[in-house]
Amino acid sequence: MPLFVLSKPITLHFLTQLRSKNTDQITFRKTLVRLGRIIGYEILNMLDYNIIEVETPLGVKAKGVYIYDLENIVIISILRAATPLVEGLLKALPTARLGVIAASRKETQVNLGYPKEMEVEIFYNKIPEINIKDNVIIADPMIATASTMLKALNIIKDKKPKRIFIVSIIISEYGLKRILESYPDVNIITVSIDPELDNRGYILPGLGDAGDRAFG
């Protein structure tokens, strides 16, 4: 299972803005867009390509790269928090088809002091046709207990895409562990792996509720 933690200064700079309680709503939303764009370019480097030859305006032939997988991308947005993140992904991957998944959830308190299990119901999904050539990106800025993501993965896996990318800004150690146990072959891209969950299921140190901070 490829795990990519984007711990470069630019991504950590934007992560720090998101974590700060002093960051206003507009800046928070725009920062999610910026990180989405950066992550989108990282995904481009992981797609399949061919070496081709082109002719320049000076009549000289030059070898280059054609990323043919650009035509086979589906982005799934976990509503509503992923909306700005997906906006950024689309700036890097403008030909992607777009789908959405919306879920309601109820925390179930168990041991260890935080919601270890969660009842999740997918009450809406609109997903374009997916085939064996497609690269599917599932975007959710915060993955805490991973119950929603596991439900989404269950839907997407049945469609047998070429590969699946999970895109987040922060994922908890516990959420990461749950995903790896059930879907060890997915690609996970994140900016930070945070160590804890509180008794409400919030990631610590985290950044609060991404949807509320982005949209009010």
From Swiss-Prot:
<dbReference type="Pfam" id="PF14681">
    <property type="entry name" value="UPRTase"/>
</dbReference>
<comment type="function">
    <text>Catalyzes the conversion of uracil and 5-phospho-alpha-D-ribose 1-diphosphate (PRPP) to UMP and diphosphate.</text>
</comment>
<dbReference type="GO" id="GO:0000287">
    <property type="term" value="F:magnesium ion binding"/>
</dbReference>
<keyword id="KW-0460">Magnesium</keyword>
<dbReference type="GO" id="GO:0004845">
    <property type="term" value="F:uracil phosphoribosyltransferase activity"/>
</dbReference>
<feature type="binding site">
    <location>
        <position position="203"/>
    </location>
    <ligand>
        <name>uracil</name>
    </ligand>
</feature>
<dbReference type="GO" id="GO:0044206">
    <property type="term" value="P:UMP salvage"/>
</dbReference>
<dbReference type="InterPro" id="IPR029057">
    <property type="entry name" value="PRTase-like"/>
</dbReference>
<feature type="binding site">
    <location>
        <begin position="208"/>
        <end position="210"/>
    </location>
    <ligand>
        <name>uracil</name>
    </ligand>
</feature>
<feature type="binding site">
    <location>
        <position position="80"/>
    </location>
    <ligand>
        <name>5-phospho-alpha-D-ribose 1-diphosphate</name>
    </ligand>
</feature>
<comment type="pathway">
    <text>Pyrimidine metabolism; UMP biosynthesis via salvage pathway; UMP from uracil: step 1/1.</text>
</comment>
<dbReference type="GO" id="GO:0005525">
    <property type="term" value="F:GTP binding"/>
</dbReference>
<comment type="similarity">
    <text>Belongs to the UPRTase family.</text>
</comment>
<keyword id="KW-0328">Glycosyltransferase</keyword>
<keyword id="KW-0021">Allosteric enzyme</keyword>
<feature type="binding site">
    <location>
        <begin position="30"/>
        <end position="34"/>
    </location>
    <ligand>
        <name>GTP</name>
    </ligand>
</feature>
<feature type="binding site">
    <location>
        <begin position="140"/>
        <end position="148"/>
    </location>
    <ligand>
        <name>5-phospho-alpha-D-ribose 1-diphosphate</name>
    </ligand>
</feature>
<protein>
    <recommendedName>
        <fullName>Uracil phosphoribosyltransferase</fullName>
        <ecNumber>2.4.2.9</ecNumber>
    </recommendedName>
</protein>
<keyword id="KW-0342">GTP-binding</keyword>
<dbReference type="GO" id="GO:0006223">
    <property type="term" value="P:uracil salvage"/>
</dbReference>
<keyword id="KW-0808">Transferase</keyword>
<dbReference type="InterPro" id="IPR034331">
    <property type="entry name" value="Upp_A"/>
</dbReference>
<dbReference type="InterPro" id="IPR005765">
    <property type="entry name" value="Ura_phspho_trans"/>
</dbReference>
<dbReference type="InterPro" id="IPR000836">
    <property type="entry name" value="PRibTrfase_dom"/>
</dbReference>
<keyword id="KW-0547">Nucleotide-binding</keyword>
<feature type="binding site">
    <location>
        <position position="209"/>
    </location>
    <ligand>
        <name>5-phospho-alpha-D-ribose 1-diphosphate</name>
    </ligand>
</feature>
<feature type="binding site">
    <location>
        <position position="105"/>
    </location>
    <ligand>
        <name>5-phospho-alpha-D-ribose 1-diphosphate</name>
    </ligand>
</feature>
